[in-house]
């Protein structure tokens, strides 16, 4: 959570608006870090900034799928944050388009998903 917040804060001097996307990794870690994530992100975002999430990356195994990235989005909304959920990340650019401004930064964050690099390239191509 602190690294995500620091990444957002590092982008803020570059533009009037930061649109940050994060794909949580693992159901257990997401559940464990839920409150910390919500607290860190809500403190880092300015009123004009946005946080977007897609569903948790599942690497397989016997994980109990008892949390969703949308749960974190709802927690953030309760704190007054502009927070949005796009279940499938392939739908992200289409959903983001109306939110782009002349002076904004798009920050993509995630971990452990081997497809993230290709996803970032695809986002770049779609912009």
Locations of regions flagged by a protein language model:
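ATP-dependent carboxylate-amine ligase
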Residues: 1-127
């Amino acid at each position: 959570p602190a690294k995500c917040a620091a990444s957002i804060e590092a982008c803020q001097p570059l533009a009037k608006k930061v649109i940050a996307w994060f794909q949580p990794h693992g159901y257990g870690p997401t559940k464990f870090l839920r409150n910390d994530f919500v607290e860190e992100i809500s403190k880092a975002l300015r009123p004009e900034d946005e946080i977007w999430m897609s569903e948790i990356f599942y690497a397989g195994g016997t994980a109990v799928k008892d949390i969703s990235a949308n749960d974190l989005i709802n927690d953030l909304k309760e704190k007054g944050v502009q927070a949005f959920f796009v279940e499938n990340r392939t739908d992200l650019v289409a959903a983001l388009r109306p939110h782009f401004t002349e002076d904004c930064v798009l920050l993509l964050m995630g971990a452990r998903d081997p497809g993230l690099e290709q996803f970032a390239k695809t986002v770049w191509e779609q912009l």
